[in-house]
Amino acid sequence: MEVPDFLYDHDEDLEHRPMLEYVLLHRVNGHIGHFQPPLSLSFYLGSKSLVIISSQQATVFLQFGNFVAWITEMIFLSWARPSPEQQKSCINKSGTFNYDTKYKGATAKPVSCIKEDKELSKDGYLINHARVLVGSGFETYEKGKTALQNWRHFGLDWAFVDPKTPIRNGEKFCVCLKEFLPWVMMPLQVVYVKENTRAKTKKAAASFGFGSGTLHGHLLAGEERFSIELDENDQVWYEVLSFSKPAHFLSFIGYPYVQLRQKYFAHQSTNAVLKHV
């Protein structure tokens, strides 16, 4: 790396100083202050604040910065509630599915088939399932269906999907979650939409549901299905079914927490649906 010419005026022996200091200088978007050889350098961050960092501190600073850059690579974060523009950017950068294509659409199968699928377990996927009675009657079913179509099941303080997002095969969208301080944007794509309409027979069942697969940039790899069902006994059930595994360093080390959050979401999501039926 070439030593900047303007630095020679401050220290004739500067070319023998550690290269890490030069790296740090080039990475800072601000004005250079002055050197205090041989232990520290001073520079402006922005245009106001003066910072003095020793060579050893500079090394730690760079190592920490590289570590943060590594663990946040391809994670879509926002300190404020994500705007439509941020969500669109997340979707545009997300690319393709991040889980095995042989499992695409697998959540459309009955729950029993998913739980008995040894291949899923062998490939490291864990299953999350919740089925809750939310009422009875065709009117309740229709209200539940409308709630899903308008993403009311994501109408939470800490989680949301743009309610204008159409539920159709191939549609990409973001699930926005607030985790501690930042919001995290999770890109997904609808892989199927299934609806069984009620026949003229009074006791016939009806159901509506859709499944979404995770895209690159999502902390997990897998698929999730949301559905509402009117059974033969005229009872209405809301169901969440997913299989997933960590797709990033952060979700890997915090997977027990992720699993708890999945169960918590299922509970909160059910309450959100109940408000609309």
Where are these regions (language model features)?
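N-terminal mitochondrial targeting presequence
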Residues: 46-49, 55
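Intrinsically disordered, low-complexity segments enriched in serine/threonine/proline/glycine
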Residues: 35-38, 51
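A conserved amphipathic terminal alpha-helix motif
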Residues: 87, 246-277
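Intrinsic disorder
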Residues: 4, 40-43, 47
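Beta-strand/loop substructures that line and gate deep hydrophobic ligand-binding cavities in soluble
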Residues: 214-260
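Hydrophobic ligand-binding cavity/cleft-lining segments
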Residues: 2-33, 54-180
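Hydrophobic-ligand binding "helix-grip"
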Residues: 180-232
